[in-house]
């Protein structure tokens, strides 16, 4: 292995090590004040069938995501089966539990490997660059949907959640993104545009530039596949169903704590658990949105980041003690982690045998 390749490997290793260390720090900050005897007692007395329902909602979201992605892939390669796309989604999510963001690239490889050959027989119809472009478009839709739901909730429920959003999200965001940062961002955008134009102008001068141009072109074809779908309304329905499942995942976990026997807990702890269990559907929607923000933190599987952000929101908005908020965060996160592990392992076996 050359020194250059070793340097790249070392940089990636450091990147993932820092990511894992950040997750450990956030987990420590989240659980350092937890009284483990009461924490375990609270988990034991919850209604586990509601937790299973949350896991099933998670699996349903994987399936709807696969069907939505299949619609984006159809203009590129209509022969890709729903099973293959579902397996790709599951394997990607499984990979993200260990290596953040890497799963998005892995699932593209699964699709390409199973794609039919092109007319010239030199590559697959769903080449890697085109599939990656569909993932870029899919994730862009997720961000737009999240922003739309967040704005709707803030407009209709500002009196309840506005203080938390302003103090914990808007002010830190505004403090980090001053004028200099926006100029830097604009400069990077212009640099990217200039780079693309340069590659296009010089595409016939060397094989390397020609290959790079081909990759960028394929990536763009994947992005614009969204506008070539015959049934765009189905894409929107699947998007709505995905976020409906996310909301159900949050609401069912709240239901799992409703009416539980808290006699084994201390008076203060049991009172806080009871307040937590009384939260309704709109609160579940807010917690879903807050939990989604944890994906911005580059840690494996959202470990630590999800727990800390959600417990902080429960403490700030509802006055629920942080250690009690951790119970909800743990049930929410770990139930979905188990669902991802089971589906990911099953899909990996399925792809290995195909």
Language model features with spans:
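Transmembrane alpha-helix interface/packing and boundary motifs in multi-pass membrane proteins
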Residues: 57, 91-100, 286-307
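Alpha-helical transmembrane segments and their lipid-water interface positions
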Residues: 57, 65, 69, 96-107, ...
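Predominantly cytoplasmic-facing regulatory/coupling regions of multi-pass membrane proteins
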Residues: 1-90, 156, 161-292, 328, ...
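Helix-loop junctions at the membrane interface of multi-pass solute transporters
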Residues: 74-76, 97, 108-123, 313-315
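Transmembrane alpha-helix boundary/hinge residues in polytopic small-molecule transporters
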Residues: 67-68, 106, 248, 305, ...
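Interfacial segments of multi-pass membrane proteins
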Residues: 111-118, 222, 286, 308-324
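Transmembrane helical bundles of ABC transporters
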Residues: 67, 71, 82, 90, ...
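Membrane-interface alpha-helices at helix entry/exit sites of multi-pass transporters
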Residues: 82-87, 104-105, 117-139, 143, ...
């Amino acid at each position: 292995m050359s020194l250059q390749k070793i340097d790249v490997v070392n940089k990636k290793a450091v990147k993932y090590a820092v990511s894992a260390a950040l997750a450990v720090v956030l987990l420590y900050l989240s659980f350092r004040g937890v009284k483990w005897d009461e924490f375990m007692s609270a988990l034991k007395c919850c209604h586990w069938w509601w937790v299973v329902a949350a896991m099933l909602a998670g699996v349903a979201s994987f399936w709807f995501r696969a069907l939505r992605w299949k619609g984006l892939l159809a203009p590129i390669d209509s022969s890709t089966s729903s099973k293959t796309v579902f397996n790709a989604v599951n394997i990607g999510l499984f990979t993200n539990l260990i290596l953040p963001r890497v799963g998005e690239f892995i699932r593209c490889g699964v699709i390409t490997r199973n794609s039919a050959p092109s007319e010239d027989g030199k590559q697959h119809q769903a080449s890697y660059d085109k599939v990656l472009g569909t993932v870029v478009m899919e994730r862009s839709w997720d961000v737009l949907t999240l922003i739309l739901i967040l704005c709707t909730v803030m407009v209709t429920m500002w009196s309840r959640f506005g203080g938390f959003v302003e103090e914990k999200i808007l002010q830190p965001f505004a403090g980090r993104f001053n004028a200099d940062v926006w100029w830097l961002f604009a400069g990077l955008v212009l640099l990217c545009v200039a780079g693309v134009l340069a590659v296009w102008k010089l595409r016939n001068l060397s094989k390397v530039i020609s290959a790079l141009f081909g990759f960028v072109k394929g990536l763009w074809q994947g992005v614009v596949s969204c506008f070539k779908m015959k049934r765009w309304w189905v894409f929107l329905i699947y998007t709505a169903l995905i976020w409906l499942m996310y909301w159900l995942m949050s609401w069912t976990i709240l239901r799992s704590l409703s009416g539980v026997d808290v006699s084994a807990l201390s008076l203060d702890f049991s009172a806080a658990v009871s307040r937590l269990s009384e939260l309704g559907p709109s609160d579940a929607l807010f917690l879903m949105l807050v939990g989604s923000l944890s994906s911005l933190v580059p840690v494996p599987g959202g470990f630590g980041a999800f727990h800390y952000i959600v417990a902080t929101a429960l403490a700030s908005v509802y006055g629920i003690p942080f250690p009690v908020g951790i119970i909800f965060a743990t049930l929410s996160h770990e139930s979905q982690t188990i669902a991802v592990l089971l589906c990911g392992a099953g899909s990996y076996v399925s792809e290995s045998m195909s």
